[in-house]
Structures are given as C-alpha cells and as structure tokens.
Amino acid sequence: MEFSIKQSPLSVQSVVKCIKMKQAPEILGSANGKTPSCEVNRECSVFLSKAQLSSSLQEGVMQKFNGHDALPFIPADKLKDLTSRVFNGEPGAHDAKLRFESQEMKGIGTPPNTTPIKNGSPEIKLKITKTYMNGKPLFESSICGDSAADVSQSEENGQKPENKARRNRKRSIKYDSLLEQGLVEAALVSKISSPSDKKIPAKKESCPNTGRDKDHLLKYNVGDLVWSKVSGYPWWPCMVSADPLLHSYTKLKGQKKSARQYHVQFFGDAPERAWIFEKSLVAFEGEGQFEKLCQESAKQAPTKAEKIKLLKPISGKLRAQWEMGIVQAEEAASMSVEERKAKFTFLYVGDQLHLNPQVAKEAGIAAESLGEMAESSGVSEEAAENPKSVREECIPMKRRRRAKLCSSAETLESHPDIGKSTPQKTAEADPRRGVGSPPGRKKTTVSMPRSRKGDAASQFLVFCQKHRDEVVAEHPDASGEEIEELLRSQWSLLSEKQRARYNTKFALVAPVQAEEDSGNVNGKKRNHTKRIQDPTEDAEAEDTPRKRLRTDKHSLRKRDTITDKTARTSSYKAMEAASSLKSQAATKNLSDACKPLKKRNRASTAASSALGFSKSSSPSASLTENEVSDSPGDEPSESPYESADETQTEVSVSSKKSERGVTAKKEYVCQLCEKPGSLLLCEGPCCGAFHLACLGLSRRPEGRFTCSECASGIHSCFVCKESKTDVKRCVVTQCGKFYHEACVKKYPLTVFESRGFRCPLHSCVSCHASNPSNPRPSKGKMMRCVRCPVAYHSGDACLAAGCSVIASNSIICTAHFTARKGKRHHAHVNVSWCFVCSKGGSLLCCESCPAAFHPDCLNIEMPDGSWFCNDCRAGKKLHFQDIIWVKLGNYRWWPAEVCHPKNVPPNIQKMKHEIGEFPVFFFGSKDYYWTHQARVFPYMEGDRGSRYQGVRGIGRVFKNALQEAEARFREIKLQREARETQESERKPPPYKHIKVNKPYGKVQIYTADISEIPKCNCKPTDENPCGFDSECLNRMLMFECHPQVCPAGEFCQNQCFTKRQYPETKIIKTDGKGWGLVAKRDIRKGEFVNEYVGELIDEEECMARIKHAHENDITHFYMLTIDKDRIIDAGPKGNYSRFMNHSCQPNCETLKWTVNGDTRVGLFAVCDIPAGTELTFNYNLDCLGNEKTVCRCGASNCSGFLGDRPKTSTTLSSEEKGKKTKKKTRRRRAKGEGKRQSEDECFRCGDGGQLVLCDRKFCTKAYHLSCLGLGKRPFGKWECPWHHCDVCGKPSTSFCHLCPNSFCKEHQDGTAFSCTPDGRSYCCEHDLGAASVRSTKTEKPPPEPGKPKGKRRRRRGWRRVTEGK
C-alpha cells in the first residue's frame, strides 16, 4: 500500500516511520497557510498497486509520532526502500506500498505522483473501516490518495453533529508505539524475503537515498549465520529467521524499547527457535571462533566460579547436538542466502514446528511429508487452499486483516522426542506446552487431563466470558457481533490442549474433583501431613493436595466486581446470554498468538498445566522470553518457572520450592511402616505418628490420642530398641526420641547440657566429619534417619549416597544396608595392601569399607573382634560426584563416579537395588551399576591403579579410564574449591561477640576494694585531665582511674577500658592471611586501640583445648597469656581484636593494665596509623610442637615463622655482608654420589612394613622392631646388629649377605662361610639355592659403598621409619 501526503513546497522529502503524525503548523502546513488538524480522518482508502513513496517533512526537525519522539535507531531517511517490501508478510501484497501525496508540489522537482498499475490488474480501491494488528487498531489516521480525497471530503460534508463527536472520540485513541514499530519492521522483513521485487522508475527521483544498503538499518538480516549465547549453555550456531507469529525477525525489548532482539533458529537435530538480544549474538565465521568466544565471555565473568563455568568443556549430553549444529552451520555458510533459507528454514505446519525434510534426512530423523504434518496438526487442506471463507467476506476489512494475521500466526511446539537436547526457546511460547516443561523435562506435578470434560459450545462460552472484557476494552467502538467474531477468530487458533483449559473448572459450579484437590487430608488441626508426589507416580492422581504458589491479584479483584462488569457489557446483545450464564472468573488472558508477550505474561491468569523441574539439556528449557539475556531494560519474570504465554498458580507439594526446604512444616512418617500419608499424631512425649491401619483402627479415636509407649510410660531406646525405664528424652522439644545414656554417648555429635542432652538427630554428620569445629552442623533443615540417630542437611552436598528418601525430611541411611544371599556384588571386599605403606602382609581390615592397614602403621596392637577405620567411626560417607575405586566381579579395581539416581538412564534406575546402594558411572567403559560402601573407596589425586595397563583390549580401556577419572577429579575439585571460597568470603567464621572477659571453670576475675585503688593528682580544671598527653600518675603506671576515686571525676580521660573507647575499625578479607582488622580513622601513636577480650581459662584447660585442636586438625589459635594461671582464649568468644594479624614489624603492641584491681590486656598504637591501614601486633608465639607456622606479614625484618624472633638490624647487616662475599666453588657430585636409600624389606624376615633404619654411613639395612626384640624405637644414633659381632659385640669383619649374622676376626674362624658366584659370602644357615634367589637383594659390606636399591626417604635419628608409597 502506498500513501502520499501533500506538503508545502519548503519541505524536504523523507520517508516517515508511521502514519499518524503530530507536527507544529509551521512545520507541517497546508498550501493556503492554514493549520491542518493534528488528527487526521479515520476513514481511509487503501490502494493495492505499485506507486512511489514520497513524503515531505521539514528538514532538521525531529519528527513526532503519536506524540512521542521518533525512535533513534531508524531515522526517517532510512525507510526509503519500503516501497518494495511486503506489508506484514501477507501473501498477495508484494506490490503494496504506503504513499503520501502532496496536495501541491510546486517548486519541487519531482515527477507527478502517478500510480503505475500492473498489466492485467485493475486498480482496486477498498474502503477500510478499521484495521487491526495483534488485537489493536493499526491505522487511526486518514490516508487518502487522489481519488480518496473526494470521498473523504464528501463524507465530512454529510456528517451529522453526533457523528462528528463520535469521530472526534475515536481520534483520541493513542496509537501504540509497539505496533508502529511492528509495522515498519514487518515491512523490512517483507523486503528481504521478496528478492524478485521490481524497481520503480520514479523511485530514484522521489527518494534519492533509496539505494542505501539495508545493513545500515539492522546489524543482522534473515539468513545471516550467528553465534548465540544462552545462559547455562555454550555458544551455539544459529540462523536469523522470521518469527511465524509476528512475521518479523527483529523487535525492541525493555521498558524503554532500547534493546533489540533477533529471532533465530538453532542448528541441530531438533527444530528450536528463540528471541535473542543483539549483545548476545556474534557473526558466525567457523568452528575455530568458539574458543575465542569462550575466552571473551570468561573475561567478563563477575566471579571466579562463573569464569570456571564458562571455560569448562561442553558436556557429553550436549556435545553430539552441538557438533551436529556446527556441521550444519558450516554447510550453510558455504551456500548463498537464498539457498540457505530454502534448505534450513523450519516448517511451520499448523501448531507444530518441523525441520526441513532434507535437513531431517541428513540428520537421520524420519521426516513426515507436508500432508502428514498438516493432517497431524489438525490443519484442513480446504482452509489452507482457500484462506478467504464465505464468512470472512462478511467481516469488515479491518477485522478481516486481523483474522489474516492470526490465521498465519501458527503457534509452535517443540519436537516430541524427549531425547533432543539442542538449544530451544519458544519466545512466543508454545501454547500447547505446560509452563516450564520443554522437551525432555519430567512433569512432576498434578496436571489437567488432556481430554475435554465439556463440549465445544460450553468451552467457547467460558472462553468468551473470560476474554470478552479485554476485547471490548481494546475495541470500544465495535458492536457485539464484531466482538463475537473477534473472539471466534481467536478461539479457532487454540489447540485442543488450550481449549481444554476452558472446561467447567471456570464455571459457576465447581466440580467434585476441585473440592477433592483442595488439600484437606484430615480434619485434625495439628496434622500437617502433606502427601509428597513422587516423580514416578501418576501425574493425574486426584488425592494429591496442592499448594498455592501465587495468588493472581487480577483474579481476586475481578471476583469482587463481577456484577459491575456484567452490567457494563450488557449492551452487547450477542454475548449477553453467555455472559449471564458464565460469570464466575473474568481474567485477562488473550490468545497467545494475538497479544504482545510482555503484557500477556503479566495479565494472564492461572492456567492448569504441569511444571517440569528436572533440568533440561537444552538451553531453551531455562530461557524464557523474560530471560534471553540481561538487558538493562528487561522486565523481570514474576516466577522462574513462567513461560511466555501462561502463568502457573498451583503446584503440588513436590515442587522445587519444597525441595529447597522452604516449607517449614514437618512432614511426619509412620513409625511402624515408615511411610508418609494421613497420619494420627501422638500427643504424648514421643511425638510419634501412625497410620490408622498400622494401629489396627478403622476410624480416628475421639479426644486426646496417645500411643502405647506414652500410655505405659516405658519407652524404647532409639539406638538399641530395648524398652526400659532408665531411658532419657532428648531435650529438643519436637524430637521425642529416648535413649540410654550409654547408647547415646557412643555418638560424637551428642551434646550434653545441664538439663540433659541433645541427640545426634539435630546435627549433620557430613558437616561434622569434614570440619568438627564448624558450628554449621546443627543449623539448617535436616533429613533424619527413621531407624537410627543419623541426620544430614537437605540437599545433595551433605546427603550420603545410598540413602533412601521416604519424605522431605525423613530418610533411611546407608547403615541399614542388608547384603542378600546369592548376590556376589553384595559381599564385603577389602584391599590386599596397606593404605599407609601400600605393602602387603598381615593386615587389619575395616568391617565397613575396603580399607586395610598394618597395625604397626597405625601404631596400635592387633585388636580383638570387629574393627572400624577412623573415617567410618567419624561417619564419613561417599557423596554424589565423588570419584571412587570400585570392585565389581572379576574386574580389577576400576575408577568410577558416584551418580545421583535421577541422573542415570531409566533402565539403570529400574534395576533392583537395596537401601544403601547407589549407581556409579565407570570411566572408560561408560557403564553404570549399583554398588555399596563395602566395595568402594575414595580416589586420591595421583592414584594410578594397576601397573599393568597395556595397550590393547581392556588394558587400553583402563588407561583411558584413569585419564578420564583424573580429569573429572580435577574438575570437581575446582568446582568445590570455588564454592567453598565463595562461601568463606561472605563473612568471617562465626564466634560469640562479648565486651568483657568471661571466666571459664575455676578462673576468677579479681575486683579490688575502692580504698586499694591508687589516686592520681590530676584536677578537673586541667586541659585534658588524665588524658593522653597529661602527667597522670596512674596512666604512667598503667593503672586505669576509677570514677569514684579520681579527682577529675567525670572529666577523667583515663577510663578507656571501662568505657570501651575504641577507634572505629572494620573486618576485611586479606590476601593470604585470612581475615584482618583495619582502622577507619587516623590513630595517633600511643592511643588505645582495643582490648583483647575472650574466655579466661587456666593452663589445664588451655592444654586440653590445644590437644583437641590437634586431634581435629584445627590450626587457628587465639590464646594470649596474662599470667601463669590465666589465659585469654578469644576463639569461641571475643571481640574485633581477635581478627588482628601477626606482624614482625607491627603497628600495635599488647600492654597489661590494671583495671579495678584486675589485670587486662590492651592494644596500643606504637606509631601513627593512617586510616585504611591494617592493625597488627607481634604474637610472640610460644610453639608447643616442632612444626612451625609460616609468617606472611611481608615485613622487611620478617623471621619467616611465627614464634621466631624478628631479625635485628645487626642480623640484617650481617646477612647483607654474607651475600656480598664470594661463594666457594664446590665440586659437583656425581649422580647418585652421597645419597643413601634404605631397603624396603626387613633384613631378618624379608617382609615390609614399619622399619627402623640403620644410622651407619652407607648402610641401607632396615629391621622390624619385633625382629630386633625391641619394644620401642631406639633413641639417638643406632647401628644395626650387622656391624657388630654376634658373639662379642666388637666391630665385624665377616658378614653374611643374606642375614644379620656377622663376626669379628676372633670368632670368624669357627664359622663356615660360603661364597656365591658373584663373590658374596653367606653363612651356613643358608643353602646355595636361597643364596642365588636372594643375592639380588643384598649389598656389599659397609666398607664398600654400594649402590642404593630402594626408594626410601632418609630420616634423622630414631625416627627413620619407612613408609610405603
């Protein structure tokens, strides 16, 4: 369509963006000088023929469109080539143009605006009463050609006054800026999609800038190849394409319409599309560009964890689809744009999205014919061939054009194959799909059945009653018949699943099932039981209660105003009967294909569909219209699970919100059958829950119910299950568990208090095992075992692999695994080597895991009965994503990864397994199997497994498995370190903040009598009485003045300890030193900084705490000694001074002051400290052990270790001189010279283990203590018996090279020695065969230095004990 507007001769021709213009009279004036009306006549004529596009605007003046400034990204002079573009993508409108003709063109050198008519096609003139686009008026101005001007003038002359007033009201309707933009962009798409448009000769004269390339308008066009980035997925190859609903490939997004989006389709084996922001697109150049894009994305990552995530390789789940997309993209890059669009553009048939048959065939996917597609999607051939039905001819042109748009807007649905995992995101959202349930997702909640419960007529009435108000609000001038036609056109576009939403659920009388779904399980107020819907259960279970996720405010508001809306819409006779019958819920939810997405997302009401919570392998699964990329103008989604066209209001209790632990109500489990459900709660002290059937009851008892144990008063111990009267209850109110004191003491997590004990069910075993000093184990939501006192935090991070989850807060832990007879993989297996020295021998085996040790390696005696290793006693269990070694069948120990049951294939999930078993993924072979703790042990960095790896067969597979396991181990380690670092940087470790010292145990705080407190000579009239610069006697003696004794009284300035007058400080995270304390203001030299506050303990308690810290790997100490009997421990309790770090050149020092008779420690500045400087003091650490802690203070005189004296100036100068002196040249030793490596076996018995090494130079012999007849290691320098005569103890001269027998010169004559072929002697206790066998393990006598054979590390003194590798 072409439109022309006559302008003044002084105007300059340019193309306008839209039709409705508001200009000042001097800018857009008529020829006679009169100001035309800013509102142009609504009646218009449309000319469907070729014509030139010309319009004139005042040069240099910013145009105003609908009262708004023109959009900056498309200036008026860039729309000159609209003349050859298809209007809104309509078929048959390739020659339609918009033309504005001037009334007078005098003085302008442009040819007359004639309308060239196509040969054989007469000029068609249609009078449009109203035109709609997306449910809104498209043109509201009068657009007149030469022939239409007379018609408009005649109509204006014949108008009645009331018609004029009505027309003026219509003019006040504001034109939607989004539709204005959509008009222009639709025309741009049409221009690009029609390559055969003919050039108009008059075009170059009237629009001199028409030939400018379209790339100046938009960065990408249809057919362009790009990389797109979707959150959580790698860069993916795409092609820009037109949206089937909007008929445009680009649009503006955000509140200010300042962020541009492009519609792209993803390459791969599944047809998927999305709207992506321009900043998330990069032009495609080839596969080699991928690494560069990943590096650039990582540079912009806000956190280290995000950077690691962006740089990690593509997961195996996405690799195949991504590689297929790369192949298709590179193939498309070699084609022309037209060939590319013809081959790779998706087919939109009915309400389904399909791959091009040629592409599907190449991808190995069975492609349907177009006829089958149309038949399956419900599109009739008749409607496809004859889009203009007889009924459509009766519809006015405005509505007909609206219907055309809606009929061509086909909603999409992803490929039904759940195995597809290419990127997908239906921006306009598939109306047939449930909210947040893309392909591959499970629907874990109760969804509406697909079958319709009412006939089509009743459903249509509900649909009309629901959406009639919105249509009326948007088209106030439409009649009732027109409203009904619009609703019918929208109804015809809905799929069967969408229509099923408008069943009697929205009627005045609710069905019985709606009442059943109300969630009222039983009438008892105290019973908070909620039935958890298991993901494997039927999705149509009717007895599952539902939980309200969000209440629609529009729905609540409209229920209150039903009568008002009924009265307001009663004038529409065609819909009056339907409205009066169905008037319960009037909510805003227009058709998905006919309403802007953002508005639909906000205004749509509750749609009964399922939420899928399992993570999809496709980026489109997590990418909705509201979260394509983080544009600053983007509006946030109301819910993370909202799709583009419908909102979810109800989900079952198995929602992700419940999985995150948001629900605070406890879910009870029957104590007899260990299953949830409708339970009867005991109101006694046990707080138990029971099924009526388990108790043998048919109905709920009246009045107060108590179980048999509470009624008798004899409870059973939760550990040993014996019923006795000496059991005690846990002090936690809601716990209700009873224990024998001896039984509960066996668990290290039991906390004894003055009023009783807190049982282990209130602390996480995993958190305590990993860090016993961390108070976190007792915080957070717990999942507790129903059979024993074991609990874990909710979530996969703490929950042990193999636990059976029976409710949201109840499990059966792995300790209850029962091995079945006849199943070989249930048998317990132990390794055949020691976990310490890696040698065989007599091993002590753990009864719970495969670990084995030499008793000597653990420095213990061989225990009697069953024995458990330290890890098993501490409660350490395997967790998901742990890398382990697994023993299965006759195979060697094989590296594998612990998997979550929901992440393994369905056939593995269905395998029969017991409580305590978990699935593992074997590296190399890519197999899965169920195993348990007794056949696995953790993988450690550097493990190599079997030394016989080979290059063929299973040996090569094992070698690949080791490489994969090592890579996966490092990847998981980095992820966990990044997560721990992020958590630790949030806030300092917890402690209790106190203001004054708190005595602990027998320690007392001294308080002096007022008469004993010294009195200073200061006067209240002094400038600074008792101040920092005064001559206060108490300050000089480091006594604090007492307010009742000091002559200065309230003016005394020597009460910093009592008044806690500290300068303002703050806690910061330092580099390499943990947390530190910095000053927020300048501090003068000698000024009081802080008091060192904590618990006052005695030396006995101090040593006990240090011992406990060493046993539990606690390396941080906060102890400061006041005197022999009192020590300040600021670890569990303290103030900000506990965060001050050590420095060898500190800016603060500790001084002991006497405050009210008691000695207290203060920190004072030793120099002027500017603001922002870290506060430090010298710890003067007293080391109790031999290990030293490295000092990281960075001072010039740093001693290198905490506790060592800092280097003095003399020491530093001597070190400088020593550096300057010439170093003596040393002779380079030959390889192996001067080194001594001990043997790995005992020289007497020949076995390995914990050995004592000989201190004689060049001697490599080692012995067991038992072989030497010693009970403990010898002290000091020790020489083995081989160097001393067996008879007299003198130095030996004759040696047996097979045993420690040796003799001096006096006694060697009576001993028979023989020689081996290599010249080595041996005593008579050995025969020649043994000599030949063991001769390779012997050395020459000590006088002759032999070559070291073993790989033992040299140690000093009696501590030289071999350790196996």
UniProtKB/Swiss-Prot annotation:
Top-level taxon: Eukaryota
GO terms for cellular component: chromatin; cytoplasm; nucleolus; nucleoplasm; nucleus
Bias type Low complexity, positions: 606-622
Biased composition (Acidic residues): 632-648
One GO term of the biological process aspect: regulation of establishment of protein localization
Domain Post-SET residues, every copy: 1187-1203
Residue numbers carrying Phosphothreonine: T110, T114, T422, T544
Function: Histone methyltransferase which specifically dimethylates nucleosomal histone H3 at 'Lys-36' (H3K36me2). Also monomethylates nucleosomal histone H3 at 'Lys-36' (H3K36me) in vitro. Does not trimethylate nucleosomal histone H3 at 'Lys-36' (H3K36me3). However, specifically trimethylates histone H3 at 'Lys-36' (H3K36me3) at euchromatic regions in embryonic stem (ES) cells. By methylating histone H3 at 'Lys-36', involved in the regulation of gene transcription during various biological processes.
Stated name of the protein: Histone-lysine N-methyltransferase NSD2
Organism: Homo sapiens (Human)
